[in-house]
Amino acid sequence: MYKEKYENWLNSKIINEEIKGELRNIKDEKEIEDRFYKDLEFGTGGLRGVIGAGSNRMNIYTVSKATQGFANYLNENFNNPSVAIAYDSRNMSKEFSKAAALTLSASGVKVYLFESLRPTPVLSFSVRYLNCQGGIVVTASHNPKQYNGYKVYDEFGGQVTDDKADKIISAANEIENFEEIKTISEGEAIEKGLLVYIGEEIDKEYTEKVKALTIRKELVEKNAKELKIIYTPIHGSGNIPVRRVLAELGYENVKVVKEQEAPDGNFPTTNYPNPESPQVFELALEMAKEEAADVIFGTDPDCDRIGVLVNEGEGKYRILTGNQTGLLLTNYILSSLKETGSLPDNGVVIKTIVTTEGARKIAEDYNVEIMDVLTGFKYIGEKIQQFNTTGDKKYLFGFEESYGYLAGDFVRDKDAVIAAMLIAEMTLYYKAKGISLYEALIKLYEKYGFFKEDLVSIELAGKEGSEKITACIDCLRKTTLTDVDGIKVLTKLDYKLRIEEDMINSAKKEIDLPPSNVLKFILEDGSYFVVRPSGTEPKMKVYLAVRGNSLENADSEIERFKDKVMSIINSKL
């Protein structure tokens, strides 16, 4: 089947010579198979893949095909639909966004296209602000430079959830050849009012909304200039919006890492533009030590995720995990709302099923409900929309362990601009009390327990890798796991079958979440591990968590637990 697809591409009158030339130069049969054995699929992050020729690659044809499916879906479900499109600093992002825009315009869908790169959360905001029926961001988030991607948003500004994604993919799969993809020239699209370039008006509205999320306004007005911040946009789209928000709030002491300031899809200072990686902060650390900075921020290329390093004193800085930053923000937001008399009775904090249980302890302390959703911020965005529709709950904060955070409800995806603003305010608050952000974290641990999490990613690329991941999880699903190193398994949660099983009493109940190929095992000491395929990369992810009685104890416990769990996982691979 892949051979036939390969030949179809070579013989197509639509495919350009550059793409055909790339295909002809492939001498490895396995490489041809990998490029054509499937079409790119929607995962937790939408469409994502290596840039290149082939049906399983990101190129203007696969982008246009997906977009034609999206256009057909929109025209079937809405009258006179419109779509907002943004893109990040990656190679081919601008070209892919233009290809998508022209396919939509040719299909009669009005397009609002940003005239230059913008963060993903700004796109989410613009969908709502412009009353669009959909949105597209061309980005591969934090993936290596050879990747690009394409995230689709619904009329509420959130990433499309499973039902809508399935309909869009189904519509795209009905397109059997590239001749069915509509196109139009840019000039004609503009002339017909089907393509409108946007920019500053949206930026201004968005910036005002972000600034309005400040909780302790007097503190910020009085002391913002005292906080020393080092910021790196890691060659991405965050540079202008993050610095603009901070500057307008009075944070005068923000210095950017010059070598990582300019947008650049080759990411020349790093192999992996991921704020989870300590390596991306090496240049920022040098600056921070010279400036005695209070905090370091780094945002990924599409500026929806943020990494944080905090000053420990004596010229040392500690990188916070996504879970640690989430705990600090959960506590800061809830305590500040309570102190200022703004904490609602029906408030909710939302986290994903692989995110720290420490947040539950904090929320319970403030009588705030905490809600678990599947991995992927789109499920948090979906809940915000449900709350706004029913009016029975008030969204306060949401986060996931992979460095994504959101306060406010005018954006429906994780937002590193909002997070940077809140983390700056939080750092300022603790500084005024004479303690660092790290000391504040230790106080939380002392109060609620020393939670420690870890993540093991097992890379298994290509068709064979994908099959191995599926087989491993299926094998684990069928295995009756009673204990890990002598510690009993209390609960097994199978999110694919949507069954929560009490392993002690053999009782079962339904999980009220959409089906997803995820397994979670909770042990009697409160530790747990989760296994799932990555939705955006050729990896299997194993999440681990323990709760210790000290930092040292938690560190040793997570290592012991990881060894035992990975021996179980590896035996299934």
PLM region spans:
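Gly/Ser/Thr-enriched, mixed-charge loops and adjacent short helices
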Residues: 31-36, 40, 148-280, 288
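Phosphate-binding and adjacent anionic-ligand microenvironments
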Residues: 293-295, 316-318, 336-532, 539-541, ...
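An N-terminal, well-structured beta->alpha segment
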Residues: 2-100, 107, 189, 195-225, ...
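Short glycine-rich or small-residue beta-strand-to-loop segments that form or flank ligand, phosphate
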Residues: 82-88, 228-231, 406, 545
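Phosphate/diphosphate-binding loops
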Residues: 115-176, 274-298, 327-333, 348-359, ...
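Short Gly/Thr/Asp-enriched flexible loops that form oxyanion-binding sites at enzyme active sites
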Residues: 96-104, 147-154, 304-324, 359-362
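N-terminal small/polar loop signature for handling phosphorylated ligands or for N-terminal nucleophile
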Residues: 84-147, 248, 252-308
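Conserved phosphate/anionic-ligand binding catalytic regions in large, soluble enzymes, centered on
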Residues: 36-56, 140-141, 233-245, 301, ...
